[in-house]
Amino acid sequence: MVLAAMLAGLQAASAGDITGKVTLSGTPPPEKVNDLIKNDPVCGKLHSDTVKTAFYVVGKDQGLGDVVLTLKGAPKSSGESAAPVVLDQKGCLYVPQILAIQTGQKLVVKNSDSVMHNVHIVPGADSGNKEANKAQAPGAPDITFAFATPETFLKFKCDVHPWMFAWVTVVDNPYFAVTDENGAFKIANVPPGKYTIEAQHRKANGGKAVTKEIEVTGSGATADFTLEVPK
């Protein structure tokens, strides 16, 4: 046990961060005004500005937001003891729209609106995760979920408000990230070794993942990606 603890300590000491940026190549189609929110008698009043779709979040120097980065070949573990991740229903939208969690990690769904929502989870046909559909009234207690099986872009929707979607990627290790609005990301404290890092966006590259081989040392590693607007 002492030797195992020493080895774990040495590994933690030599762990490094993976940093990088995802850039979008090409011009995405214009985002559309969400007329369903605009014309809804309750949800429309929750927004002072026009609400548009957000399929492509493009920031400084064509940095692409909402890209999920995962690490293949990393040691698998459960996220049961990890801090919960929050998915809010605010302004009749799921916030954030894209997020990632670890298997076993708690996902806490809130309703910050003054209107009824229902949290409808629709897993892939062969994913192994279970469908769920739970109503959540204004001021109702948070609803907590956890998922046992990895899945890419697990769908959350609201049947009351058909424009509401979120997409949750479930990962079997703690080494993942979602790019910010400028395309930047960091995966922290990765054990030293060789890995395959994968970048995936729901729309860019036709939704297909792009991979790179990297080696992480105590100095970390860099992985930049360019994803394309489908032609």
Annotated model-derived regions:
Residues 13-231:
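Extracytoplasmic copper-binding redox domains, predominantly the cupredoxin/blue-copper superfamily
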